[in-house]
């Protein structure tokens, strides 16, 4: 039986190698921790249908390799992404320091309107923390990002990170800030009736006015 959904969103999971991107994806899709996680080679893919604000949304999620040698390959997957999880490891300042470069790639190669949530992963390793919550919050605020600390091991805030990103995209569609019909938006309608309901006013038929004669 074919899946039915109102919208399809293309998501990216980006950030340096070793930050737990694949484990976040696995926790979100399978609801369990990926014990034998190796570095991603190129890209990995997962999908899940979720309910967000009364709408059924299919998330197509591309988990990209963090190593520099794969950047030319993974960058080709950025195009047409509606949302992204930008991931760093709270126990590794090096992964935090590279966030600006990853964010530039996302906004340049995907879309200037891409919705990004910053995820400080490995929250379960708090005693080994190298990046404070306050510092990361400041980075998120300066770059107009949402922010959560997550744990792929315990599952803390993993679901919320994906859903918060999807919820923001839906709100932007409702407000007219994002147009699903625009090429490269990373958004597709799953139900044809929704497309008709959300046609721009200029495209809808104008009711005839009485002539007054």
Swiss-Prot record:
Signal in keyword set: no
One Pfam family in the UniProt entry: Ras
Species classification: Eukaryota, Metazoa, Chordata, Craniata, Vertebrata
Gene: RAB4B
An example Gene Ontology biological process: regulation of endocytosis
Binding site for Mg(2+): 22, 40, 63
Switch 1 (motif): residue ranges: 39-44
Positions contributing to GDP binding: 18-23, 121-122, 124, 152-153
Residue interval(s) of motif Switch 2: 65-74
Protein name: Ras-related protein Rab-4B
Protein family according to the UniProt entry: Belongs to the small GTPase superfamily. Rab family.
Catalytic activity: GTP + H2O = GDP + phosphate + H(+)
Domain notes: Switch 1, switch 2 and the interswitch regions are characteristic of Rab GTPases and mediate the interactions with Rab downstream effectors. The switch regions undergo conformational changes upon nucleotide binding which drives interaction with specific sets of effector proteins, with most effectors only binding to GTP-bound Rab.
GO molecular function: G protein activity; GTP binding; GTPase activity
């Amino acid at each position: 039986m074919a899946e039915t959904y109102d919208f399809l969103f293309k998501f990216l999971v980006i950030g340096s190698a070793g930050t737990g991107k694949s484990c976040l994806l696995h926790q979100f899709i399978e609801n369990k921790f990926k014990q034998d996680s190796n570095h991603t080679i190129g890209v990995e893919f997962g999908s899940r249908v979720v309910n967000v604000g009364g709408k059924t949304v299919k998330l197509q999620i591309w988990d990209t390799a963090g190593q520099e040698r794969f950047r030319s390959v993974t960058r080709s997957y950025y195009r047409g992404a509606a949302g992204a999880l930008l991931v760093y490891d709270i126990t590794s300042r090096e992964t935090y320091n590279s966030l600006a470069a990853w964010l530039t790639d996302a906004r340049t190669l995907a879309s200037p309107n891409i919705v990004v949530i910053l995820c400080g992963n490995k929250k379960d390793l708090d005693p080994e923390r190298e990046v404070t919550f306050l510092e990361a919050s400041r980075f998120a605020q300066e770059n107009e990002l949402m922010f959560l600390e997550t744990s792929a091991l315990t599952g803390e805030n993993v679901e919320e990170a994906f859903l918060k990103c999807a919820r923001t995209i839906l709100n932007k569609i409702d407000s007219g800030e994002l147009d699903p019909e625009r090429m490269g938006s990373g958004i597709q309608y799953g139900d044809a009736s929704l497309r008709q309901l959300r046609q721009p006013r200029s495209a809808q038929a104008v009711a005839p006015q009485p002539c007054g004669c």
